Amino acid sequence: MQLKNSMLLLTALAAGSSVARLHGHERRHLHHAGEKREVGDTVYATINGVLVSWINEWSGEAKTSDAPVSQATPVSNAVAAAAAASTPEPSSSHSDSSSSSGVSADWTNTPAEGEYCTDGFGGRTEPSGSGIFYKGNVGKPWGSNIIEVSPENAKKYKHVAQFVGSDTDPWTVVFWNKIGPDGGLTGWYGNSALTLHLEAGETKYVAFDENSQGAWGAAKGDELPKDQFGGYSCTWGEFDFDSKINQGWSGWDVSAIQAENAHHEVQGMKICNHAGELCSIISHGLSKVIDAYTADLAGVDGIGGKVVPGPTRLVVNLDYKE
């Protein structure tokens, strides 16, 4: 999901009060479904430190599963980056949810009538802006478009991700919108729409409201590492659910760009659809990278998973090792 910088962006950033903050932040992740990755297109991956590529043979036909979730050919997932002109004050929405954790056997199901639950979400913000400055739904109040839901209620929501914790250690996951509470491209600067703490082996569920764009960061322990500017510098999972600017498509990817640029640890993360397909993977220490972003691939378009308009069910494995 990469979108290359424009002269407009560079001009806007140069006009800011701290141009030095560009370093390590020239590229941040947004999403744009402008190009489809068809059969015959090139897929990039880094395996054992070697950049390789192969021809995509995925036609988009999903394997048979019990869940009535639409699947599609993965398309180009655009990602772009921008630096904040000034460091915003961190904001926290519903920082820790009280929903019970556990594993649901039917969370991948969807309502028969297509009437999705919105309980727990706040109000919706109207979309504005364009390109990398596009602002979708960030919730009213900010961050209320991302909520933890109970295992038994997960199936009622349209866009849901199942988070599977580390096998060995407690981990923390922080979620944010691309657009921060100050209205700028600052969501990852210490802000939290939702914070989850997962014990070893624990599973939790998160629902995302329509037209939401943002990311989550995950790391061992009670908090996420930050770079010298206050931005989260761990492995990210990026999302764009039901994007109005992209005609309702949804997409995701794993990114180590921020961790690499800060010279911090690269945590393992794997994001796939519920059928185990359309995966974006970074294993611990970058030992394997498949359809995911590293600093070396920051300028490559067409990385990550993408599905046509409709419900989304993702499985996120934290502390992924292979």
Swiss-Prot record:
Chief location: secreted
Entry GO CC: extracellular region
Leader sequence residues: 1-20
Protein location: Secreted
Keyword Ribosomal protein: no
Skewed-composition ranges (Low complexity): 80-105
Gene Ontology molecular function terms on file: IgE binding
Region (Disordered): 80-109
Superkingdom, natural source: Eukaryota
Any Pfam family matching the protein: Allergen_Asp_f_4
Keywords noted in UniProt: Allergen, Secreted, Signal
Classification via PANTHER family: ALLERGEN ASP F4 (AFU_ORTHOLOGUE AFUA_2G03830)-RELATED (PTHR42039:SF2), PUTATIVE (AFU_ORTHOLOGUE AFUA_3G02940)-RELATED (PTHR42039)
Protein name as catalogued: Allergen Asp f 4
Protein's organism: Aspergillus fumigatus (strain ATCC MYA-4609 / CBS 101355 / FGSC A1100 / Af293)
